[in-house]
């Protein structure tokens, strides 16, 4: 453009034509009539920095949803193996829960003594219940699958951290 033309991006819903036979020419004439009458309002087009920020925040949202999905998948896997951590731990992905899951991924089961070692702070009030909730067992494939799920969760957290630094 040579600077003599003003471009307006308008919402199509704001320029509905009367029903009937439609052609591109009739639509163009109708839009020109609305524009001359001052009845078309341009849509908001954010600046380039705002558009970039929106891209990042949308991607951040999708990563957060991915993390939630991954956590649900891990919890379901643990429960299918007989580990009911979420019954007694408020956040199974907190310090205590994650330590127990890492141990399970390595060995496939956890002893009451190991539970004592991994359970921290507030969760200690429910220590006996937690010991009962972790009486399941994992075979080699289930342990490997848990390792993969935990690794994927960690990678998602790393991506989230990178995006948040950019935002």
Predicted regions and their residues:
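A detector of single, family-specific signature residues
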Residues: 1-167
């Amino acid at each position: 453009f040579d600077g003599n033309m003003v471009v307006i991006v308008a919402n199509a819903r704001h320029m509905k034509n009367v029903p009937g036979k439609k052609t591109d020419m009739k639509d163009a004439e109708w839009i020109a009539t609305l524009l001359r009458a001052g009845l078309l309002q341009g849509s908001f087009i954010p600046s380039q920095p705002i558009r970039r920020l929106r891209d990042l925040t949308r991607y951040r949202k999708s990563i957060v949803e991915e993390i939630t999905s991954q956590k649900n998948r891990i919890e379901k896997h643990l429960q299918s193996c007989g580990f009911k951590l979420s019954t007694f731990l408020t956040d199974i992905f907190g310090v205590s829960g994650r330590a127990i899951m890492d141990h399970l991924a390595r060995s496939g089961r956890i002893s009451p003594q190991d539970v004592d070692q991994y359970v921290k702070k507030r969760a200690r009030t429910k220590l006996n219940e937690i010991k009962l909730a972790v009486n399941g067992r994992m075979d080699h494939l289930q342990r490997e699958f848990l390792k993969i799920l935990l690794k994927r969760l960690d990678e998602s957290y790393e991506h989230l951290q990178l995006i948040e630094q950019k935002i």
